[in-house]
Amino acid sequence: MMRSLALVLAACGSVIAAAPASADWRSQYRELGFGVIPVETQTQAMASFEAFIPYASQKLGVPVRLFTASDFIGVNNALIAKQIHFAWSSSSAMAGSWLECRCVEPIVAALDKDGNLGYNAVLIVRADSPFQTVDDLKGKIVARTEPNSQSGFLVPTIEFAKMGKPVDRFFNSPVSGGHTQSVLGVLNGTYDAAFTWTTRGDGYGQIRTMIDKGMLRRDQIRVIWESDLVPAPPVIVHRDMPADLKETLIEFFVNLHRDRPDLARAVAHGETQGFVRVDLTKYESTIESRRMLRDARRRGG
């Protein structure tokens, strides 16, 4: 009888051991959609990820499709609707989506070239402009990007209010629609200044991307205000994503810099020491800032 019981248990063990293979996420997902916003144009975004997409498809074992939208909320909405499966987002957009649906979460983010997990919002002016300080810009045209941008909207809105210089009152502050538009607007004189993002030494971020694309020379602009370090833009997924798929994506990104540093650089938009695992706790301050901004708007403040 003991021998029969052992055989039964062995058979059950075989079934259990085989279960993960039969339940592998690839049996549910014939392809994966990866969402990004174009730093330049949609055509250039496709070119920037030309090598990443086939590499990701090979490593993940299913075709990966690139999805682009004009802003972060478009990318996040596609993720929430499960039209795509993972996305490069802004911390602020992720926090805003989380407050609305509690259905998205960050899985990895890129370190900068010095190993910092974050970046700085900056206020830039033309190098040949007369503006030297924030106070010099009172009443001037100072662009923010769009409401779901961490560095281009949320951080300056919150931080300048704390300084007693609310952006909407201290400046004339139009919304440019994106970081590229903001920087180009400063260069061509449309804006006196604009908020954007970078890391120490411009290792990655908007300034580095535009320098690498030949759209900007570093000596054309000056930074006259810089925020404290804010959480790095995360790669996000839907919270009900199967755990094995989530772990596969995390492993893929964590190993990307080791295996293909050129592709890690493309995803991070500049120099990086690689991607590391993150979770919602890393973004608690951003979520709280979005909550404060949302509540102030509801009060009409």
Question: Each predicted region: which residue ranges?
Answer:
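Boundary at the C-terminal end of the N-terminal hydrophobic targeting segment
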Residues: 17-23
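Pocket-lining segment of extracytoplasmic ligand-binding domains
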Residues: 129, 141-244
